[in-house]
């Protein structure tokens, strides 16, 4: 879990930027988007193979 404390004389905007950066480093937002709706394992495998095919060409 990302935790960001506001430092002395730091603006809220700067703290928010640090928080967002820490979330993106952890991959939290991507994980939330991925798990928002259930995806059957067969669909997940199909998407994975399509992505690999796109990378190949």
Swiss-Prot record:
It comes from the Bacteria. It holds the Pfam family Ribosomal_S21. One of its GO terms (molecular function) is structural constituent of ribosome. The keyword Ribonucleoprotein applies. InterPro entries: Ribosomal_bS21, Ribosomal_bS21_CS, Ribosomal_bS21_sf. Transmembrane segments: none annotated. One of its GO terms (biological process) is translation. Residues 33-57 have a biased composition (Basic residues). GO terms for cellular component: ribonucleoprotein complex; ribosome. Residues 31-57 are annotated as: Disordered. Keywords: Ribonucleoprotein, Ribosomal protein. NCBIfam families: S21p. PANTHER family: MITOCHONDRIAL 28S RIBOSOMAL PROTEIN S21, SMALL RIBOSOMAL SUBUNIT PROTEIN BS21. Belongs to the bacterial ribosomal protein bS21 family. HAMAP family: Ribosomal_bS21 (MF_00358). This is Small ribosomal subunit protein bS21. It comes from Halalkalibacterium halodurans (strain ATCC BAA-125 / DSM 18197 / FERM 7344 / JCM 9153 / C-125) (Bacillus halodurans). The lineage of its organism: Bacteria, Bacillati, Bacillota, Bacilli, Bacillales.
